[in-house]
Regions:
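Long, compositionally biased intrinsically disordered regions
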Residues: 166-167
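Catalytic cores of extracellular degradative/oxidative enzymes
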Residues: 2-13, 48
Length: 167
């Protein structure tokens, strides 16, 4: 992700390593190496291809593209980025089915269109308010992937405190 990077601007070379998430993942892998129930896939690149049954997911932060605040919303930059990444990965013999991104902190569950955009656990903050981003409640993407049919069910995981929020 870009929130835990060590530099103000993202790097191109060794970008994954210039990040506290990468460091933490390696520390956890070391700590849990004797537990054979847990495996780690810690990519050295900004993207990770993850096969689940017959479906291949491309996990990427999503900050490699710009835009999303115009009249077309997030769709034009997301679809451009997906098309470019799919073309690149397919040319290397590694096509993917669904691209999963975060970056915009807006939940879009469109697996049938090859796209899942994750929401944000923390919800709205000062940056979102001063940037005039639309309000979105804290939420995360949840889906079920099955053999042969891929993603068959999707739902938001709504994050909140029922008691303090009174619901």
């Amino acid at each position: 992700g870009n929130h835990s990077r060590r530099t103000h601007k993202p790097r191109a070379k060794l970008r994954a390593r210039d990040n506290f998430d990468w460091f933490l993942a390696h520390q956890l892998a070391l700590l849990l190496k004797s537990d054979d129930r847990i495996t780690f896939q810690i990519p050295e690149a900004t993207d990770a291809l993850v096969p689940v049954h017959d479906t291949t997911f491309l996990l990427t932060h999503g900050d490699q593209t710009r835009g999303g605040s115009g009249i077309g919303g997030l769709w034009p930059p997301l679809l451009r980025m997906r098309a470019k990444k799919l073309q690149n990965y397919a040319s290397m013999g590694s096509p993917f089915d669904i691209m999963d991104v975060g970056h915009w902190h807006t939940l879009i569950q469109a697996a049938s269109n090859g796209l899942i955009v994750n929401g944000s656990l923390k919800g709205r903050d000062a940056y979102a308010a001063t940037s005039n981003f639309s309000f979105e409640a804290p939420q995360q993407a949840l889906w079920v992937t099955v053999p042969k049919n891929g993603v068959v069910w999707q739902a938001p995981v709504l994050v909140g405190d029922r008691k303090s929020e009174g619901w």
